């Protein structure tokens, strides 16, 4: 099964963050989304990403024109790699049950 993040959400997120990759996780990635479900994106950034790009507010700004429930969570590559080994973290869920929906060429 391949899940797809809506272009109306993914395109502005990629333009705003210029990430290494974007991982769809949660119910949409598992194929269990309902009409009331949100879209969860973990946005993996370079380790030298400016701190202002790593905030919850940056995630909101990136998805500002997408008018459906969505969580856009930015994370540095090194943080993702470290936390992806810790069960119960968002990084772990994204690494083990998520689907890469964008990867920088």
Enumerate the language-model features and the residues they cover.
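Glycine-rich beta-strand-to-loop/alpha-helix junction loops that act as flexible
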Residues: 25-27
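Short beta-strand->loop micro-motif that forms the acidic, two-metal-ion catalytic signature
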Residues: 40-43
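Catalytic core of pol beta-like nucleotidyltransferases
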Residues: 1-21, 30-35, 45-105
């Amino acid at each position: 099964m391949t899940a797809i993040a809506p272009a109306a959400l993914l395109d502005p997120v990629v333009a705003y963050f210029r990430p290494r990759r974007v991982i769809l996780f949660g119910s949409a990635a598992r194929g269990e989304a309902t009409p009331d479900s949100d879209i969860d994106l973990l946005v993996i950034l370079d380790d030298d990403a400016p701190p202002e790009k790593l905030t919850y507010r940056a995630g909101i700004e990136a998805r500002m024109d997408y008018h459906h429930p969505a969580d856009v969570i930015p994370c540095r590559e090194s943080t993702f790699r470290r936390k992806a080994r810790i069960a119960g973290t968002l990084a772990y869920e994204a690494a083990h049950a998520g689907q890469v929906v964008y990867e920088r060429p």
